[in-house]
């Protein structure tokens, strides 16, 4: 009888020991896995050109912004530079459509590389000379026969917003035949968001998030810029989230959006953006 008690005691002791070892083993494996992943990420980013120059200071927050759409008036039409060669239409109220009576030759030759600062500057100057508030728009790129320019606010550049867009149409001779313009003003912090506990983010944090999704690989070249990306409108006013734009190898653009709940990585395309601007047909409604 005594021997049975001793055996039972040993069995229980071994069971308790096994349970203890299991609980000790799993955290250790998770820790080792985390260390390996961190070491792997550090090795990749260590070879990425432009990474060492980034700041790890958390200087940006997820404070959301809002703006007001400009409603164009007849007085605005009188302020359009060189408007004697234009037919102007503001029938849609928040969009100005301009058609040139005589096509305007651009001061550049296509294609234009993203790092051709001289050509991009010449395009921006052309817009300044022919567009209302033209100095506030910055050239983004070309998609087919259309050139995209996005409005830049005092707080930073906006990206892929239908409400702060200049869309220039060119013909087969690379001459400007028309453009469509939207414009925002009163760009400010969203009041409903000001009382919330804001989270802080850094350039390094944004880049690491991309690398963890294998969007940045060894020996890539990156460039990080700050700006604002449109979000779902919670009212009649356009809403924007702060964003880090990460350009990889001067080809692919990713946006690390600082949304209210959690960050989100998004990679828009020019073609997709332009398609979203097209009005719905009766078949798709």
Task: Report the location of each language-model feature.
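Hydrophobic residues embedded in beta-strands of well-ordered beta-sheets
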Residues: 96, 145-147, 174-177, 263
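Noncatalytic linker/hinge segments flanking ATPase motor cores
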Residues: 52-61, 189-191, 264-269
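Preferential activation on post-signal-peptide N-terminal prodomains/segments
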Residues: 1-138, 143-147, 153-157
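Exposed beta-strand-loop-beta-strand "reactive/processing" segments of non-cytosolic proteins
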Residues: 128-172, 225-258
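Extracytoplasmic/luminal low-complexity segments enriched in Pro/Gly and acidic/polar residues
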Residues: 194-285
């Amino acid at each position: 009888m005594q021997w049975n008690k001793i055996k039972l005691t040993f069995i229980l002791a071994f069971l308790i020991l096994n349970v203890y070892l299991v609980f000790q083993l799993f955290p250790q494996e998770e820790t080792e896995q985390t260390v390996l992943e961190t070491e792997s990420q550090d090795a990749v980013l260590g070879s990425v050109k432009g990474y060492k120059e980034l700041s790890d200071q958390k200087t940006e927050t997820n404070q959301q912004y809002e703006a007001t759409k400009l409603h164009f008036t007849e007085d605005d039409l009188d302020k359009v530079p060189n408007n004697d060669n234009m037919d102007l239409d503001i029938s849609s109220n928040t969009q100005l459509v301009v058609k040139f009576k005589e096509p305007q030759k651009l001061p550049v030759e296509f294609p234009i590389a993203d790092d051709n600062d001289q050509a991009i500057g010449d395009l921006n100057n052309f817009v300044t000379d022919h567009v209302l508030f033209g100095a506030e728009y910055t050239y983004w790129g070309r998609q087919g026969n259309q050139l995209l320019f996005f409005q830049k606010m005092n707080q930073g550049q906006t990206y892929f917003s239908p409400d702060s867009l200049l869309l220039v149409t060119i013909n087969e001779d690379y001459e400007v035949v028309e453009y469509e313009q939207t414009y925002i003003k009163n760009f400010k912090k969203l009041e409903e968001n000001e009382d919330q506990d804001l989270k802080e983010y850094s350039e390094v944090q944004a880049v690491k998030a991309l690398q963890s999704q294998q969007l940045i690989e060894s020996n890539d070249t990156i460039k990080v810029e700050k700006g604002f990306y449109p979000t779902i409108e919670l009212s009649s006013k356009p809403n924007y989230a702060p964003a880090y734009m990460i350009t990889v190898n001067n080809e692919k653009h990713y946006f690390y959006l600082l949304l209210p709940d959690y960050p989100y990585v998004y990679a828009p395309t020019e073609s997709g953006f332009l398609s979203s601007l097209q009005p719905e047909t009766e078949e798709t409604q």
